[in-house]
Amino acid sequence: MDVKIIYGSDTGNTDYVIETYLLNELSVHFDNVVQVDIYNIDPNEWLSNDLFIIGIPTWYDGELQSDWDDYIEDFKKLDFKGKTFAIFGLGDQIGYGEYFVDGIGILAEVILANGGQIIGHWPTEGYTFSESKALVDENHFFGLAIDEDNEDEMTFDRVRIWVEQLGNEVKELL
């Protein structure tokens, strides 16, 4: 299965995580990996049967990154039946603990409402936050939560383990 990373990044942190960690790890488990900035997305990108990995930082008080915010109304109109997604998000669990990685949850809600399947749920254990829209249940996020502000030393291991998990989950789907 091919992988399409679709992401937005204002400050470059999401881009950094993709370039520094995610691309290398994904190439171990998947044949072809491409990345597409949501700012430049062609609507036909969604027509493939790739694994879509969504990258979304959360801004301010639980808001979407600016390019995702500009695209969200179009995103809500897409049909995701038969499509598989994984989501990773960046947030600050200390400074914005009441909105930690809310962007994951906002996009997950749309994906599920439009018929998509989300793999790659990630445990909440080890994080310190008070609330999050990204929770699939009390013990898991819809996707990988990354805190480059407070736990950047943990990003590599989290990405590595998550990508291995994605590889295993995709094998089960095929």
Which sequence ranges carry the predicted segments?
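Short helix-loop-beta junction
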Residues: I18-D31, E109-A113
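TIR-domain catalytic/interaction hotspot
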Residues: N40-D50
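A generic secondary-structure micro-motif detector
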Residues: T11, N32, Y96-G97
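Conserved beta-strand termini and adjacent loop/short-helix elements that scaffold enzyme active sites
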Residues: I6, V36-I38, H121-T124
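N-terminal beta1-alpha1 ligand-phosphate binding loop
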Residues: D2-E25
